[in-house]
C-alpha cells in the first residue's frame, strides 16, 4: 500500500518526523560550530539555512578583500600627498618657536606661492601671461614702475583707429568667428604689416616686415601664418563706416580703469578670520598707512567710483579711503570702517565686501605671521602683506611680502632685496602699482580665465553678427541673400526652411506645367490638386417634353431649400409622389428663358442621403450627352448641402453659376464627386418616360465651384430627352 510521505511545514501546521527533526538539529549544530573555523576550512557555498552570523562574517571579509587594493592606493596617495606638504609647518608651530616671525607662511597643504628673493618657489617671469606696455594716454611713473596691461587690448586704438586700415570677418570657421584688422606702416624706411587677429580663444597682435615679399600676402595666408588650423578660410570685408568704434569697444572690454581693494587690520598673534574682522579700533600707525594710500572721503553723496559701497543711505559705513592713481580710480574697503554687527562673530557685513575683492592688503602692526588660507574666500587670490617698523619714529619703514595662489602668474614691479621701503611717495607708487598689476594677473588664473573666455566668445559673436548685418545692409542685401561660408550651417531650423522653399518651388513648377498641358487647369480626376480656374465647364444638354404634371407642380408654392450638414429625408408616399411630380415638372421644352415660368418653378428641398439618393423610378438604361464649352441649360446648386435643383431657364442658371463663382473660395481637403442623372429615350411609362442612371464625375477638391463647400456636394440632375413618339403625343 502506497503511503504518502509526511512534509515539514514551517508554519507549524504539519507533522514532523522524529528522524527528520534529529537530522535538522545536527545540521544546525554543525553550521553553528563552523562559524569558529577559519575561512579556508569553511565550505565554499554555505547552505540557504546558514545562520546570519556566518553569512555576515563572510560578506564583510569579502568586501575587505575587494577593497584592499583601493585602500592601499588611497593610503599611498595620502602619504605622498602629505609628504609633499610636510615642510610647511602650521601657524601654531611657528608661534611656538618664538619671534622673529616671517610675514607670510604657506598653508600646510600648499596652494600658494610667496614672492621673496630668498624663496626658491617664486614663479619666474616667463610664467607670466601679461606684458608690460606703457600707454601714451596715461601719466608716466616718476620712479619707473610700469603698469602691466594687455597690449592687444589697446593696440587697435593706438595703431589703427583714425588711420587707413582694413577689417575682415570670417564666419563659422573651425576656430569660430574671426575678425582681422590689417594695416601697412613704414618705420625707418622699412615697410611693416601690422595685424590683429581676434578669436574666441585670444587676440593676437603682430607686426611683420614686408622686405622679403614681392607682393602682399592674402588674408587667408595671413590667418594661416598666425594659426595652423586657420586654413582654407574665406574672409569678407567689413563695409560699415562705424565699424572702427565697434571693434575698439570690443578690444577694450578687458581694460579696467576702476579698482577696489580690501584692507585688513591684523593685530599681534591674531590667527583667525573672526579675529581679523572683529577689529574696530584703529591705531595711529594704521591711520598713517591709510593716509598714505589715499584720501579719507565721506560716502554720503560721493560722486566718484564707489566700489560697491552705499553712497545714498549709509548702510556700508560713513567713511572710506579713495584715490586716483595714474588716471585710474581706486576705492579701498577698510575693515575697520565697514559696519560692525554686535553678536556676529563672522562679521558678514565686512566680509561681504572684502571677500568679494580679488586683492587685499594685510596691515600688521607687530611681528605676526599671516597664512593666505586664513580668510575663506573664492575671490581673494593675492595678498600684499605690509608690516610697519618704527611706527613712532620719523624714519618709519614698511616691510613688504607678496603671496598669491599657484595659478596666478607673477607680476611686477619686483620686490627689492631687502623688501623694505621708507615712508615716501615712492613706496606709495610701488604699492599701488603692485596692487593693480596683481589684479590683472589674477584675472589669468584658471577660475577667472574661464569666465573671461566665455565673455570674450559671446562678445565676439555679437560683434561678428553686427558687422555682418551692417555690411549686408550697406550692400542692399537682405537676410534671404545671406549665405553661410566655410561649411557652416544654420541648424535644423535653417535646413527645414530651405527644404520648404525647395518644395514650394517644385510645386509651382508642376502647376505651371499642368496648366500648359490642360489649358490652365488640372484634370478633376487628380485628387489633391492645386486650386485653379478652368474655362471649360461640362454641362448636360437636354430637351425634355412637356409633362401633364407641370400644371400640378406650378400650382404648388416654391419650397425653400434647407441648408445643413444632414438634410431632412422625405419618407412615405407623399415624398415619393412629390419627387415623381418634380421629375415630371422639368419635362417641358425650355429652349428660351421664361420669367413667368421661373417664378413658379419649384426648387425642392433635398430628399436624399449622400449614400442613398432618391431618384425617379425608371428602369430603362439612360444615356448622357455632354456638351463642351457652352453655358446653356446648366443647373447648379449654390447650397453647401446635397440638393435637387430644377432648371427654370438659361438666365436663371447663368445667374446662379455666377453667384457660385463669386463666393469666397476655400479649399476642401476631401475629394468631391458629382452625380449626374439623365433619362434614356426608351420608356415604358408615358408619364416618366425613362429611367435615371447615375454617372459619377470626380472633381478636384480645389475646384472653384466647389471650394466654398466644407464637404462633398452631391448634385443630381434629372434629364429627359425627347424622342419621336413623345413629341407626337403633344
Curated annotation (Swiss-Prot):
This chain's protein is named Rap1 GTPase-activating protein 2
Query: Domain of life, per the record?
Result: Eukaryota
Instruction: Provide the gene name from the record.
Output: RAP1GAP2
In what ranges is there compositional bias, type Basic and acidic residues?
617-630
**Which portions of this protein are annotated as coiled-coil regions?**
none
Location of the Rap-GAP domain? 247-463
Tell me the InterPro entries matching this sequence.
Rap/Ran-GAP_sf, Rap/Ran_GAP_dom, Rap1_Ran_GAP
**Which spans does this entry mark as compositional bias, Polar residues?**
535-557, 597-612, 699-712
Q: What is the organism of origin for this protein?
A: Gallus gallus
Q: Which GO terms describe its cellular component?
A: cytoplasm; plasma membrane
**Chain segments carrying region Disordered:** 510-668, 698-730
Q: Which GO terms describe its biological process?
A: regulation of small GTPase mediated signal transduction
Q: Which SUPFAM superfamilies match?
A: Rap/Ran-GAP (SSF111347)
Say where the protein is mainly found.
cytoplasm
- Output one GO MF annotation: GTPase activator activity
Q: What keywords would UniProt list here?
A: Cytoplasm, GTPase activation
